[in-house]
Curated annotation (Swiss-Prot):
Motif (Mediates retrograde transport to the ER): 317-320
Disulfide pairings: none
Role summary: Multifunctional protein which functions as a transmembrane receptor in the planar cell polarity (PCP) and is involved in the assembly of the proton-transporting vacuolar (V)-ATPase protein pump. As transmembrane receptor mediates fz/PCP signaling through interaction with fz and stabilizes asymmetric PCP domains through its interaction with stan. Also mediates Wnt/beta-cat signaling through interaction with fz/fz2.
Effect in UniProt of substituting R248A: Prevents cleavage
Record-level GO cellular component terms: apical part of cell; apical plasma membrane; axon; cell surface; endoplasmic reticulum membrane; external side of plasma membrane; extracellular region; Golgi membrane
UniProt modification remark: Proteolytically cleaved by a furin-like convertase in the trans-Golgi network to generate N- and C-terminal fragments. Cleavage is reduced in the fat body.
Pfam families, A to Z: Renin_r, RENR_N
Subunit structure of this chain's protein: Interacts with fz and fz2. Interacts (via N-terminus) with stan. As an accessory component of the multisubunit proton-transporting vacuolar (V)-ATPase protein pump, might interacts with VhaAC45.
Keywords, alphabetical: Cell membrane, Cleavage on pair of basic residues, Endoplasmic reticulum, Golgi apparatus, Membrane, Receptor, Secreted, Signal, Transmembrane, Transmembrane helix
Full protein name: ATPase H(+)-transporting accessory protein 2
InterPro entries: Renin_r_C, Renin_rcpt
Residues forming coiled coils: none
Source species of the chain: Drosophila melanogaster (Fruit fly)
A GO BP annotation: axonal transport
């Protein structure tokens, strides 16, 4: 029975696991221990807490340990890869399973919270490629970022997805080259790339995806080396999320309206404010009147000549 339960638990974990949370570099002030899986919508909280900030959440994940609260991470670099569950890493790293598909939403919340607190942050998301390029240039400057060289199975002339992926890898390489001289110095740098297009064009288990994995691994290692050279108190994290379709499902659940395609406000006629004011002030006057009547009844003194006292006095005399 125990064996069946263990197998069933592993099966459920395999279904829910959609990626990995890998710590490639950390300052001595913090450490990552244990092997518990991390829910993807808490990724932003983990990064936020690693910089010494208080987080409000109900997670029971205990992988993060703060050894020295006075020398925490001065900077955080995260590379998030969509469309693949694992990116090859080298060296002594700590990896946790990611469950769910809320990494993007968690990173969006982290970026918004940092911006609200006037903390410098560079959030470069290539899901919308043109917006990602503009964000990269605003952070690193108007440099030319040459695309990665094509491989045997990644051909930019045949597949648009291959071309965009090679350009994204090129931006990671250029980020490593200009990390020490950023146009917008930031404490948090987030780079989000995608292998989803390559996987759809060639297949999830194709050689092209393996080559994309190697290119990403080399580019991330290059950025890691640049971060270690610039500072020894940088937390460098790599996250992956394979189930991209599930993360986008919420956006597609509500179909576009055919009667109101521009999402305009509901139109009200010219009689609406008149009727609204009549009802509003009637209810106000009615409420005040009712309050006054209740107060008057409560404070009323009937007096000795009232029927209440006369009936009471007569009954007392009769009883005697």
């Amino acid at each position: 029975m125990l064996r069946v339960f263990v197998i069933f638990s592993l099966f459920i974990a395999a279904i829910n696991a959609s990626g990995e949370f890998t710590v490639l570099n950390r300052p001595k002030a913090i450490s990552f221990k244990g092997n518990d899986a991390l829910e993807s919508h808490y990724v932003g909280d983990v990064l936020y807490a690693s910089m010494g900030n208080a987080v409000s959440g109900d997670t029971n994940w205990n992988g993060l340990t703060i050894n020295d609260p006075f020398n925490l991470a001065k900077g955080v670099i995260l590379v998030h890869v969509q469309g693949i569950g694992h990116v090859t890493t080298a060296g002594n790293v700590k990896t946790y399973e990611l469950t769910g598909s809320g990494t993007d939403a968690s990173l969006n919340a982290l970026a918004a919270e940092l911006e609200a607190a006037n903390e410098p942050v560079c959030d470069i998301n290539f899901e919308q490629f043109d917006d990602g390029v503009q964000a990269w240039k605003s952070c690193f400057g108007d440099f030319e970022a040459p695309a990665a060289k094509p491989t045997k199975h990644l051909n930019p002339s045949l597949h648009t997805a291959d071309k965009q992926f090679l350009q994204e890898v090129g931006f990671i390489n250029s980020a490593a080259d200009h990390l020490a001289e950023m146009a917008k110095p930031s404490n948090v740098l987030m780079l989000r790339v995608s292998v989803d297009g390559v996987a759809k064009a060639h297949g999830e288990k194709s050689v092209a995806v393996e080559e994309a994995n190697k290119l990403l691994s080399a580019a991330i290692s290059r950025l890691l080396a640049a971060s270690q050279k610039s500072s020894d108190s940088v937390l460098f994290v790599q996250t992956t999320e394979k189930d991209v379709a599930a993360s986008r499902a919420k956006r597609d659940t509500i179909a576009a309206s055919t009667t109101n395609p521009y999402n305009l406000a509901v139109y009200y006629g010219s009689d609406y404010p008149v009727i609204f004011n009549i009802i509003l002030w009637f209810m106000v006057v009615f409420g005040l009147s009712l309050l006054a009547i209740c107060y008057a009844i409560a404070a009323m003194d009937p007096g000795r000549d009232s029927i209440i006292y006369r009936m009471t006095s007569t009954r007392i005399k009769k009883d005697n």
